Regions:
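Short, charged, surface-exposed interaction patches
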Residues: 2-237
């Protein structure tokens, strides 16, 4: 009789423990409640580097004469840059000669056989000086320098190189904004905000401060650096 009671007690304890483990197993596998939020941070910055390719060309049937005119134009461009405080800013000088008679695919009907083009690349941290000079290129045209259009790449490109210096502050601000949004959601839903489950800083963008149709951010000296952080927070309660 006592052996039967002992066996029944052991069996009952086994059922109780089994139920405890099963219940807690389901609880551990219950889906975690999370909220996904985004935090935005922006900072207005000023370009700290200007890169400006100045391309000009001459054409004719006498190669030596064409090259002489290009040398004259090169002197005019260098003098113009020196006048605007950019005499030491020429980082590169390239020359290209095109002989139309040597182009098998070209038409034999042409006025000038030779085209000689030169490019002076200006690279300067004096952004204001470059901007002022770029607005005065009519002086070069008045001196007979034929500046060549480069389509959407015309004019200087204004760059901001200090992204890495401000990146930590931007990320901190973006995460703070995201946490504030998550805390508000937790409050409104009657929950408590838990730890970060997942985080994605996203891309850091450099945008024109004043957006305009067809305008590139490289054409504007004033820019906006933006970062968007996406975070998943656990919810408690």
């Amino acid at each position: 009789m006592q052996q039967r009671l002992l066996a029944a007690s052991i069996l009952a304890v086994g059922f109780v423990l089994g139920g405890w483990f099963v219940g807690h197993g389901f609880a551990a596998r219950a889906p975690q409640r999370i909220v996904t939020v985004k935090g935005l941070a922006e900072r207005n910055v000023h370009a700290d580097l200007a890169v400006w390719p100045l391309r000009f060309a001459e054409a004719g049937n006498n190669l030596a004469a064409v090259q002489a005119r290009v040398q004259r134009d090169t002197g005019s461009v260098r003098a113009f840059l020196a006048l605007h405080g950019l005499g030491e800013a020429v980082a590169q000088h390239s020359l290209q000669v095109t002989d139309r008679a040597a182009q098998r695919w070209g038409s034999p009907q042409y006025k000038d056989r030779y085209i000689v083009s030169a490019t002076l690349l200006v690279r300067s941290h004096d952004v204001s000086a470059v901007a002022t000079a770029a607005q005065a290129t009519g002086q070069l045209v008045g001196q007979g320098v034929s500046l060549q259009s480069q389509g959407s790449e015309d004019g200087p490109s204004y760059l901001f190189t200090g992204v890495n210096a401000i990146k930590p502050q931007l990320l901190t601000a973006a995460i703070k904004a995201a946490r504030s949004a998550a805390a508000q959601f937790a409050h409104d839903s009657g929950s408590r905000l838990g730890p970060i489950v997942r985080a994605n800083q996203g891309l850091i963008e450099i945008l024109p401060r004043d957006p305009a149709p067809g305008a590139r951010q490289q054409q504007q000296i004033d820019k906006t650096v933006r970062v968007v952080a996406t975070l998943d927070y656990a919810l408690r309660g």
